[in-house]
């Protein structure tokens, strides 16, 4: 249907906006226009009613028979509806074109539109048009009205018949029945009117029913809308609650997700800890097995040591028993010698004046010569007995001869008593070996028993001394005590050849001895006594007492624990202390530190250090600088000034030296010291050389490696700050690995050490157990991986001194080196930053130390990681 066929149009929009019903029009006005439009529409309906009445009057005046009267149309309620219907369709007729006449329109409606569509709200006659626009009406009631079908043709026909009957006046006077309002009441209604009224009543009833239904529908729709609104409100509240619950659930899900991630991380951490614990447990089991094996070895060693001690104690007991027997035999021989001496003195006492006269004379006549010869016979015959006599007097507490005899040189030879029987160079051999010599005179004077006693006693004494000299030397205290006793007896024999004022057994013997010495001189001379030169074998030897031997043995046990300075002071106490303090067995560990020494002093020590196995020179200083001597001249004059004395020490120690330490001796001991050690001490096992002025180079390392192949511990890191920091380089590390593949402990350092040299060192030294890095560049995880890839599988101790290291590098070392038992990190802020006093450097250094300290909380690091921070943080 086109828009012009619709019955209602909008008064605001015009003809182009038409509607099927008033409810649609009202809805359009309410939503498209303001409420004023509804008021205008109600007024327009009233005007339309007036216009319809005027149009009906005009049609009646024109003479159209079918046009009803306006009064009748307005008086009858149905007519009003018809007039309103005609006015409602007026716009439609105007839009379609002018109609020829009113009757044609009615005829058209009567024949072509028997039924007309009226709105339900216009059906009741008592409901005016103004009530349609009342503001009190519910909008839903106005929009929900429906159309009612009415038979318009029948109604118009009946209406026209009624109008014609009313318009024809009856004969007689007076106005007709339809002339006025007063004439209509007495007239009886016609059947058509009755039928019309009945139909109109039925239409009203039907319309009212429709309206009631519409009102119920409106109320129902309102209730439904209210219920829907309430339900929507409840649904919105429920939706908001659900949204809040959803947000809470989302947050809870996020929290659970985070907790899940934390639990997964914790689980992974626990798994890693379990792995580390398993590895640690395995390593502990392996260590336990090693410890058990080591314990079994130690137990075997203890058993062997106990057996050795028992055997040594048995040998010592037997040696003491033999020594006691030997001393008792010596005492018995001394007694016999005294008795023989008394016999000889009594035999010589018959002619004392002649002997003294011949001894004091200076002529070279025959009797003068024979006199000294006879005196020499008596002296030679009493040589051995006089020795024992001196021993007895020296051992007695009353004489104190051992304390009055001056100390002799300890380097004297170990000669035996046979030297007393040899002739002096000044004397002729005919006096001792000829027919009138010593042997024949002794036999003629003393008899056969006395003649055989002197050779027998001298032979026994010589055999005893040889047995002591051939005794094997050990480094134990028991063996060293024996060395002291042996050397004490031999040295006392040489020391007994002191001044001539040593007390003699008796005045009867002194005279013949002195006269013999004087007469033995080829140049002759006066009768006054003259001293024999020190160390001359013509003097009688002294045998020390057992008490002195025990005292020297006790001193030796004590002096082995004294340092070098104390030993030098102890040698100035007395002869016995001097003897023990300068015995080579005491100077096994030589330590010189914090002192000013010269080369001559070291050369003097060399004569006592023949058995030294450890030599330590630390922080030694040369002579003081002169007032007029410049620093350059002083440095040139003192450079290597102790190397000559060190060479004497090394030459004296020889193959006995096992440990050599030279540290903090700048300029006075250079790297030439290691070259000297390689020449003289080829049995070295531990070498330490640290210098700030002359660090070792690859040439010196090559020389040391060529001469000393048994070194297992090497400490050659330069001191910091070093005057030649690049001298110790990767080439030195490579040379160390080639020279000593069985190295166990090593200390290197310096700016010249790089990852290449460390990797080569780790590859060659597969048995390395202790590694110390001093002032090396930063050790990162990459450097640690490169070094551990080549070796260090058996490393037990890692020391990083002033060497920056990252926590990951330490973790890598701990994971690769299974036998690692200790990691020592000594760091300072100056090792990381050039400006340690700046706040940023201090803060970064504190963070680094905190990270390193955090490693101690990891499993396996708490007991092996030791961090030492210089100055604290």
Swiss-Prot record:
Compositional bias annotation for Low complexity: 179-192
Ranges of Pro residues composition bias in the record: 168-178
Keyword terms, alphabetized: Coiled coil, Methylation, Phosphoprotein, Ubl conjugation pathway
List of residues that carry Phosphoserine: 476, 760
Domain F-box: 548-592
Record keyword Phosphoprotein present: yes
Biased composition (Gly residues): 357-371
Region (Disordered): 85-110, 163-193, 345-540
Recorded coiled-coil stretches: 207-349
Cleavable signal peptide: none
Residues with Omega-N-methylarginine modification: 358
Modified residues (Phosphothreonine): 477
Biased composition (Polar residues): 85-97, 384-414, 442-456
Gene Ontology biological process terms, A to Z: chemical synaptic transmission; dentate gyrus development; gene expression; hippocampus development; neuron maturation; neuron migration
GO cellular component, one term: synapse
Domain of life: Eukaryota
Entries under SUPFAM superfamilies matching the protein: F-box domain, RNI-like
Subunit structure: Directly interacts with SKP1 and CUL1.
Function, as annotated: Substrate-recognition component of the SCF (SKP1-CUL1-F-box protein)-type E3 ubiquitin ligase complex.
Protein name: F-box only protein 41
Lineage of origin: Eukaryota, Metazoa, Chordata, Craniata, Vertebrata
């Amino acid at each position: 249907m086109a828009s012009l066929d619709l019955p209602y149009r909008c008064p605001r929009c015009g003809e182009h906006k038409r509607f099927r019903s008033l409810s649609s029009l009202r809805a359009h006005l309410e939503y498209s226009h303001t409420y004023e439009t509804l008021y205008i529409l109600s007024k327009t309906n009233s005007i339309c009613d007036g216009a319809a009445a005027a149009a009906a009057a005009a049609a009646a005046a024109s003479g159209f028979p079918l046009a009803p009267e306006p009064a009748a149309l307005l008086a009858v309620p149905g007519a009003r509806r018809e007039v309103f219907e005609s006015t409602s369709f007026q716009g439609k007729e105007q839009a379609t074109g002018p109609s020829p006449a009113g009757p044609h329109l009615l005829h058209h409606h009567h024949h072509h539109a028997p039924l007309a569509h009226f709105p339900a709200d216009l059906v009741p006659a008592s409901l005016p048009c103004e009530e349609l626009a009342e503001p009190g009406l519910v909008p839903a009631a106005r929009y929900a009205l429906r159309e009612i079908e009415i038979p318009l043709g029948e109604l118009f026909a009946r209406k026209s018949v009624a109008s014609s009957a009313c318009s024809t006046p009856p004969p007689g006077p007076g106005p007709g029945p339809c002339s006025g309002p007063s004439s209509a009441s007495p007239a009886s209604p016609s059947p058509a009117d009755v039928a019309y009224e009945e139909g109109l009543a039925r239409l009203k009833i039907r319309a009212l029913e429709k309206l009631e239904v519409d009102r119920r529908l409106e109320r129902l729709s309102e209730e439904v809308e209210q219920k829907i609104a309430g339900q929507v409100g409840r649904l919105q509240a429920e939706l908001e609650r659900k949204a809040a619950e959803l947000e809470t659930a989302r947050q809870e899900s996020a929290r659970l997700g985070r907790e899940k991630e934390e639990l997964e991380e914790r689980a992974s951490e626990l798994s890693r800890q379990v792995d580390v614990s398993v590895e640690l447990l395995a390593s502990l089991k392996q260590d336990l097995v090693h410890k058990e094996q080591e314990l079994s070895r130690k137990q075997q060693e203890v058993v062997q040591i106990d057996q050795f001690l028992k055997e040594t104690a048995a040998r010592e007991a037997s040696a003491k028993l033999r020594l006691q027997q030997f001393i008792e035999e010596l005492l018995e021989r001394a007694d016999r010698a005294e008795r023989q001496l008394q016999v000889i003195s009594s035999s010589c006492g018959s002619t004392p004046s002649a002997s003294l006269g011949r001894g004091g004379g200076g002529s070279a006549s025959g009797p003068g010569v024979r006199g000294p010869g006879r005196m020499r016979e008596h002296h030679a015959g009493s040589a051995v007995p006089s020795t024992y006599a001196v021993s007895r007097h020296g051992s007695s507490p009353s004489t104190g001869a051992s304390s009055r005899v001056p100390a002799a040189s300890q380097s004297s030879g170990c000669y035996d008593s046979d030297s007393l029987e040899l002739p002096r160079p000044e004397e002729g051999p005919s006096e001792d070996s000829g027919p009138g010599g010593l042997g024949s005179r002794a036999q003629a004077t003393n008899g056969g028993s006395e003649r055989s006693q002197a050779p027998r006693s001298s032979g026994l004494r010589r055999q005893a001394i040889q047995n002591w000299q051939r005794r094997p030397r050990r480094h134990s205290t028991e063996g060293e005590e024996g060395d002291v006793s042996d050397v004490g007896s031999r040295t006392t024999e040489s020391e007994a050849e002191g001044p001539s004022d040593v007390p003699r057994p008796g005045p009867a013997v002194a005279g013949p001895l002195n006269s013999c010495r004087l007469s033995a001189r080829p140049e002759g001379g006066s009768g006054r006594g003259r001293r024999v030169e020190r160390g001359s074998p013509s003097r009688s030897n002294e045998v020390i007492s057992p008490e002195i031997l025990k005292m020297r043995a006790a001193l030796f046990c004590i002096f082995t624990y004294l340092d070098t300075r104390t030993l030098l002071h102890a040698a100035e106490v007395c002869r016995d202390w001097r003897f023990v303090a300068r015995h080579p067995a005491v100077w096994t560990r030589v330590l010189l530190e914090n002192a000013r020494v010269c080369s001559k002093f070291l050369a003097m020590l060399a004569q006592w250090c023949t058995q030294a196995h450890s030599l330590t020179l630390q922080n030694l200083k040369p002579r003081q600088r002169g007032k007029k001597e410049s620093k350059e001249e002083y440095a040139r004059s003192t450079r290597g000034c102790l190397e000559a004395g060190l060479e004497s020490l090394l030459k004296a120690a020889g193959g006995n030296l096992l440990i050599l330490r030279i540290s903090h001796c700048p300029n006075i001991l250079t790297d030439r010291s290691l070259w000297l050690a390689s020449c003289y001490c080829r049995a070295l096992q531990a070498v330490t050389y640290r210098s700030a002025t002359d660090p070792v180079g690859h040439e010196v390392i090559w020389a040391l490696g060529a001469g000393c192949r048994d070194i297992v511990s090497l400490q050659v890191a330069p001191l910091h700050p070093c005057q030649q920091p690049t001298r110790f380089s990767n080439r030195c590390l490579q040379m160390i690995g080639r020279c000593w593949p069985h190295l166990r402990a090593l200390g290197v350092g310096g700016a010249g050490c790089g990852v290449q040299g460390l990797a080569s060192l780790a590859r060659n030294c597969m048995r390395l157990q202790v590694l110390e890095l001093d002032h090396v560049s930063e050790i990162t995880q990459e450097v640690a991986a490169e070094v551990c890839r080549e070796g260090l599988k058996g490393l037990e101790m890692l020391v990083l001194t002033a060497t920056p290291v990252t926590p990951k590098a330490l973790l890598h070392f701990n994971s690769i080196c299974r036998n690692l038992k200790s990691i020592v990190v000594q760091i300072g802020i100056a090792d990381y930053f050039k400006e340690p006093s700046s706040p940023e450097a201090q803060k970064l250094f504190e963070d680094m130390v905190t990270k390193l300290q955090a490693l101690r909380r990891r499993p396996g690091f708490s007991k092996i990681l030791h961090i030492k921070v210089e100055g604290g943080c």
